[in-house]
A protein has these predicted regions:
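Conserved catalytic alpha/beta core of Sir2/sirtuin-type deacylases, generalized to analogous enzyme cores
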Residues: 1-116
Length: 116
């Protein structure tokens, strides 16, 4: 696979399985599956960003895999907020935990954020 990135909306659903428009191989989502490793350069880029951010909003993770916790810890100067219906492995790492579903809470969050 050539790792070409493209929007799935550009591909008609009638052409399933979705193939890469560049090389013709099976397309896959731009995510890391369980058992796969992360691209080290992307991790370093994320860590650099997180160490400089003011606010980190962590939405909907169980925290049962190590990377979300590791990345949350890297935002050590930031106000860390968790949005999750249940306590998670991230809960001890944040200053604020909001117990709600993202679909319900995010519209209110954005409304307040945009209000100033």
């Amino acid at each position: 696979a050539c790792k070409t990135k493209f929007e799935i909306s550009e591909t008609p659903l009638s052409s399933i399985p979705v193939l890469c428009p560049n090389c013709g191989s099976l397309a896959r989502p731009h995510i890391v599956w369980f058992g796969e490793s992360y691209d080290e350069s992307l991790i370093q880029e994320a860590v650099s960003f997180l160490r400089q951010c003011d606010v980190l909003l962590v939405i909907g993770t169980s925290g049962m895999v190590s990377m979300p916790g590791f990345l949350t810890e890297q935002a050590f100067r930031a106000q860390r907020i968790e949005l999750n219906p249940e306590p998670s492995g991230i809960t001890p790492l944040v200053q604020i935990s909001i117990r709600a579903k993202a679909a319900e809470a995010m519209p209110l969050f954005w409304e307040r954020l945009n209000a100033g």
